[in-house]
Amino acid sequence: MSMQDPISDMLTRLRNGQTAKKVAVKMPSSKQKVAIAALLKEEGFVAEFTVTGDVKPELEVTLKYFEANPVIEQIQRVSRPGLRIYKKKDALPSVMGGLGIAVVSTSKGLMTDRAARKAGLGGEIICYVA
């Protein structure tokens, strides 16, 4: 069976992994998934990520916990294949009053809502993480 929305699959694996108190989760790799994992690591939501394998690359994300509680409280897909959500630079959302991030796909690549606002770019809202 083919996967219709690989980004939703990634976010669901992260959410389920943290609910089950897993140390790490594995998933098929893609450039966009690696970019999202890099943003999550940069913002402190995950501990580490690695890409292994040449023929079928696999992304392994090491989850992060604080006092036995998951660091990611909420992770939600916004723009999806059936309904794309685009926002201009002035309309970019602030997640949990700035405590969370919105991952935005811009013409300059994936970045957080704060970085997109600073660069004066709008784009597709991929997901919210808090």
Curated annotation (Swiss-Prot):
One of the primary rRNA binding proteins, it binds directly to 16S rRNA central domain where it helps coordinate assembly of the platform of the 30S subunit. GO terms for molecular function: rRNA binding; structural constituent of ribosome. It comes from the Bacteria. InterPro entries: Ribosomal_uS8, Ribosomal_uS8_CS, Ribosomal_uS8_sf. HAMAP family: Ribosomal_uS8_B (MF_01302_B). Part of the 30S ribosomal subunit. Contacts proteins S5 and S12. This is Small ribosomal subunit protein uS8. The gene is rpsH. Coiled coil: none annotated. One of its GO terms (cellular component) is ribonucleoprotein complex. Keywords: Ribonucleoprotein, Ribosomal protein, RNA-binding, rRNA-binding. GO terms for biological process: translation. Pfam families: Ribosomal_S8. Belongs to the universal ribosomal protein uS8 family.
